[in-house]
């Protein structure tokens, strides 16, 4: 495929851009006067100018040297019917014909099987060896010189036209695309003709070709000055569509062309297409034109008198001859491994493409055949090298295709003895560095600390509650409770914190700090905010019912007895 980095013009342009940057730096005073860089920078544009002049002179020389000669034509002699068919009792159906060059007319016997063909134009070619066929009910139209497509070109062998082709681009290369049996046959092509002028064919390269009957094509690299001399322009290869109106061109010379119109039809195999355009001898390789471009190339007849066959040019250029790995999606064709071909229910055709290799073509699939033709696992046992023979319990390798005289794995490897310690070795004084221990808090230690903290807090609260109860009993003016105490969900420690002296509160805070510093931090918990739903509403209702029951309970009027004080137990949450 064409790559811009490999073109000499691209490299020269890049060098001139660099030199232009250097010259700009020189103009702005970026280099010293004695430096050699400005000289090299001026030499590059000068060499580029010489190269362009030499290239233009070479092109002019080749253009002038290419000779444009008048197209050679065959002086065809034919006879024209002068009378209607008539019946002769002895000879059958007869007709009178007169020669085209003038002279006396002759009487010709008409074959009875041809009588039905006399009412219209010629339907089927008379040459039995021809691969072309007209289509019943179709007619040929004359084409004025200059009205044919600009990409169409005739292929000549002496004065005879042996086929047609078109100029197009395949994998980035400008080339001639035609049928292989036109370019490589006994009648060697000698010239390309366009609008009555022809250019002699030289030893042009054919990098890609296939001689299979169903996939008949060749790619010829024609020099650009030849295309320019003939006035042939490139065309585009497009994907064919079903029931697409198409036209084929052909004739005895490039300035005496006929055209036939028909309909293009796609078949199960994507590399093939059929059309109903009438053709004649010498039309092989002619492009099949649609309103969008070239959809295929005519190669022969499919059903004589009804359908003709062509090669899908878009499939060939974009799937078989494409150097890129990415395939276009227009035809939905995929490449499969070679071993998957046998798993398909239909038959693949095997083709060999010069310049690409062998391939298997299916309906919407194709596979490239490995160079050996099969994988190593498919080799027959006879093709494998003979194994060694066993004689008297020993393996004889003389008859085997091996490079050793003894087996690689005998009984076992020889035993190895450890080396004695070296006497000159001395002990080193280096000490092993101790790794710093990471602080950790085991679960049992944490549990014991929490238990001791709770017991300490509980004892202090019991002592303070007893002191408060004793002082309240000794007080004469202390009124009783005016109302029943309400149940509170506040922790016990928070309620009685005001009752604890300041000295005890400091001790408790120090204990809490010591316990929390030895406790590892808890994992963060992500709080998810839920939207109110049926479950949350039912939870709120049940909470309201519980609060109503608590409010309707009978309040306790009696004060706690000093003889039986109720110790208050608090948890770590209240600290």
Curated annotation (Swiss-Prot):
Q: A Gene Ontology MF term for this entry?
A: serine-type endopeptidase activity
Q: List the disulfide bonds.
A: none
Q: What is this protein called?
A: Polyprotein P2A
Q: Name one GO biological process term.
A: proteolysis
Membrane-spanning ranges: 10-30, 36-56, 74-96
List the active site.
181 (for protease activity), 216 (for protease activity), 284 (for protease activity)
> Which parts of the sequence belong to the Peptidase S39 domain?
135-335
Protein keywords: Covalent protein-RNA linkage, Host membrane, Hydrolase, Membrane, Protease, Serine protease, Transferase, Transmembrane, Transmembrane helix
Question: Which species is this record about?
Answer: Southern bean mosaic virus (isolate Bean/United States/Arkansas)
The lineage, from the top, is: Viruses, Riboviria, Orthornavirae, Pisuviricota, Pisoniviricetes
The EC number(s) given in the record are: 3.4.21.-
Q: Which Gene3D superfamilies match?
A: Trypsin-like serine proteases (2.40.10.10)
**Origin, by domain of life?**
Viruses
PTM annotation: The polyprotein is proteolytically cleaved into several chains by the viral protease.
- Bias class Basic residues marks the residues at 541-553
Record field: compositional bias (Polar residues): 558-575
């Amino acid at each position: 495929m064409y790559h811009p980095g490999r073109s000499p013009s691209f490299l020269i342009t890049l060098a001139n851009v660099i030199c232009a940057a250097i010259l700009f730096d020189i103009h702005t005073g970026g280099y010293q006067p004695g430096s050699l860089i400005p000289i090299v920078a001026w030499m590059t544009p000068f060499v580029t100018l010489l190269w362009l002049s030499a290239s233009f002179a070479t092109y002019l020389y080749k253009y002038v040297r290419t000779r444009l000669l008048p197209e050679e034509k065959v002086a065809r002699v034919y006879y024209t019917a002068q009378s209607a068919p008539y019946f002769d009792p002895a000879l059958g159906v007869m007709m009178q014909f007169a020669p085209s060059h003038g002279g006396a007319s002759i009487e010709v016997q008409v074959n009875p099987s041809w009588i039905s063909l006399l009412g219209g134009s010629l339907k089927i070619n008379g040459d039995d060896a021809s691969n072309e066929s007209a289509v019943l009910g179709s007619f040929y139209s004359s084409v004025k010189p200059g009205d044919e497509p600009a990409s169409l070109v005739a292929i000549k062998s002496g004065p005879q036209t042996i086929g047609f082709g078109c100029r197009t681009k395949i994998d980035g290369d400008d080339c001639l695309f035609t049928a292989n049996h036109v370019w490589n046959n006994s009648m060697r092509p000698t010239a390309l003709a366009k609008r009555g002028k022809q250019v002699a064919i030289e030893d042009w390269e054919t990098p890609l070709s296939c001689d299979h009957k169903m996939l008949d094509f060749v790619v010829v690299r024609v020099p650009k000055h030849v295309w320019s001399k003939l006035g042939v322009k490139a065309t585009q290869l497009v994907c064919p569509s079903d029931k697409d109106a198409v036209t084929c061109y052909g004739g005895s010379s490039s300035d005496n062309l006929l055209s036939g119109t028909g309909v293009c039809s796609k078949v199960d195999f994507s590399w093939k297409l059929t059309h109903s355009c009438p053709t004649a001898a010498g039309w092989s390789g002619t492009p099949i034109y649609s309103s969008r471009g070239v959809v295929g190339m005519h190669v022969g007849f499919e059903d004589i008198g009804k359908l003709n066959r062509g090669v899908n040019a878009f499939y060939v250029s974009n799937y078989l001859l494409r150097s890129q790995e990415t395939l276009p999606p227009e035809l939905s064709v995929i490449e499969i491994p070679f071993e998957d071909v046998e798993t398909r229910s239909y038959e693949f055709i095997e083709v060999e493409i010069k310049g690409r290799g062998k391939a298997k073509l299916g309906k919407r699939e194709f596979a490239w055949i490995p160079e050996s033709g099969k994988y190593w696992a498919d080799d027959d046992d006879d093709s494998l090298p003979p194994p060694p023979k066993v004689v008297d319990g020993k393996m004889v390798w003389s008859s085997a295709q091996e490079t050793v005289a003894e087996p690689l794995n005998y009984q076992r490897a020889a035993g190895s003895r450890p080396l004695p310690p070296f006497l000159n070795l001395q002990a080193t004084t280096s000490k092993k560095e101790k790794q710093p221990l990471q602080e950790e808090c085991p679960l049992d230690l944490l549990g014991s600390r929490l238990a001791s903290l709770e017991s300490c807090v509980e004892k202090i609260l019991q002592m303070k509650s007893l002191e408060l109860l004793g002082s309240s009993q000794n007080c004469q003016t202390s009124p009783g409770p005016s109302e029943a105490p309400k149940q509170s969900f506040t922790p016990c420690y928070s309620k009685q914190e005001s009752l604890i002296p300041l000295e005890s509160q400091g001790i408790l805070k120090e204990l809490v700090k010591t316990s929390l510093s030895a406790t590892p931090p808890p994992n963060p918990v992500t709080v998810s905010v839920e939207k109110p739903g049926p479950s949350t509403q039912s939870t709120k209702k049940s909470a309201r019912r519980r609060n109503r029951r608590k409010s309707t309970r009978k309040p306790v009027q009696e004060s706690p007895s000093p003889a039986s004080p109720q110790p208050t137990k608090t948890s770590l949450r209240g600290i």
